[in-house]
């Protein structure tokens, strides 16, 4: 965590020369070299098109909170033109999409009500006085993607006589050694160093799983394959994938996506472990794999039962027949299983599904009896509302343990706080200085994320559009070398990533 006020402006001048803060050996293209077509109107935007890319010329709307579109009329927005949002007094919050590379001179000049700006990690150049006169803007996070930012871009306004004044205590969040960092130095602003961001994403859940695999493995003998439209088998399979040093990839029921096929080819894998029965991954899909990968029946293994409870048991039995620890999670909630999957993998502990109340599934009950005397400690993830005390007393008894002593509950007030409590209780499992973020209300982009965080030995943070008090408190106590994000900006928006960075700065 770094917060510094430099001793003198002249010291800063010695560090960087010229009117713009530019990274060494980085040259930003000049948008003045583009000859655009005549302006066209789409909704509140006037825009021009050059070489298939959109330049926003003027915004005519009155929105207070605005996310600038990444595309207009099917063409990507690449440039926010000079003075495009000038004097937009209604604007209080704006998000600039990752499609944008250039924020031109005076783009948001004198947006006097603007308090919050999210600059996505596609932006490379920020022009002169782009945010001049935004007196209510007290801080900004300049991402590491920005290679050129003019000295007078942020933190200045003029009085009635035209005298330039500085916004009091203006603060820049930036990565060390970046253009934003040098901009803070040259302007003698306070600054705080944030971790770099690594976003691992594809165009869909299958491509994201393949991208996570590629990030983790240069090659692999084995691949674990799970159904991509459900979470139960995939998340129960994270400890197995970690044990086998295998990526976890996803498929449809009857057709294996090209992204998955291509990743298996890249890995050179010759063994595929299928999670779940033919109701989720059919023989038709297996035959496709055989044909396209030139494999035979001997290259496949299926771990399955008639339900998610039974499949989780089959996976557990194969992964570790003699577990000393075990995790219970609610069968109908992906969040808790996702939160604990990497921890379970690191501890070589199976993930077993339970209902909220009632009787324990017969297959699960038989499994618990089979590991009775082996399991010394078990953990139930989530509060009494997801797995009741009554159910836990039954599960503990089946293991020959006592709920409240050798079987303990790890829970917060909601899925986000439960995830935080997991990270605190099992902090010893995390040796990495990294942290990963996944969407809390949906599972697709993060299904394979558990294997990544297990291999990298990093905690998982579940969040959506904001951070609650428990998450902010957790982040403030820690520094991270990298923040990894699972999925695109539609799953985990840049505004949320920035909140994580700022909370831990």
Kindly give the residue locations of the regions a language model identified.
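Short loop/helix-cap segments at secondary-structure boundaries that form the rim of catalytic
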Residues: 181-186, 287-288
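Structural signature of tandem-repeat unit edges
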Residues: 21-24, 44-52, 61-79, 89-102, ...
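Sec-dependent signal peptide cleavage junction
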Residues: 19-41
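Extracellular glycan-binding segments that recognize GlcNAc-based cell-wall polysaccharides
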Residues: 193-505
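Consensus positions within tandem repeat domains that build extended binding/scaffold surfaces
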Residues: 82-84, 104-107, 127-132, 152-153
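Long, low-complexity, intrinsically disordered polar/charged segments
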Residues: 132, 140-175, 213-224, 320-325, ...
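Sec-dependent N-terminal signal peptides of Gram-positive bacterial secreted proteins and lipoproteins
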Residues: 2-27
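Conserved functional micro-motifs across diverse proteins
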Residues: 55-56
